[in-house]
Amino acid sequence: MALVLTVNSDAWNKHVESLTSTVSGLIPVVKGNGYGFGRDWLAQRATRIASTLAVGTVFEVGSVPTAATPMVLTPTLEVPHDLRADAILTV
C-alpha cells in the first residue's frame, strides 16, 4: 500500500516564509529522503532560506547546492576523499 502526500504549496510556502522572518540564524535540515519531498529538491528550496544547510551524514553533502555551505550533523570516523572542502563536520 502506497502513501501519497499532498501539500498545499501556497499555505506551506507562507508558513515557511512566516517562520523564517521570525527566527534569526535558522539552519534548515535536509536529510534522509528529504521528508518525502526528495533531498535534492528540498535542499534547493532551503537555499532560499539560508546559506548553510545541515545534512545527516557526509554521504548527503552532495545534495547541498554549491552556493550553500553544508553542515554535517552526524560525526564520522572516515571522511570521504571527495568531500567538499567547505563542509562543516561535527565531532
Enumerate the predicted regions with their spans:
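Active-site-proximal beta-alpha core segment in soluble small-molecule metabolic enzymes
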Residues: L3-T6, A11-K14, S24-V91
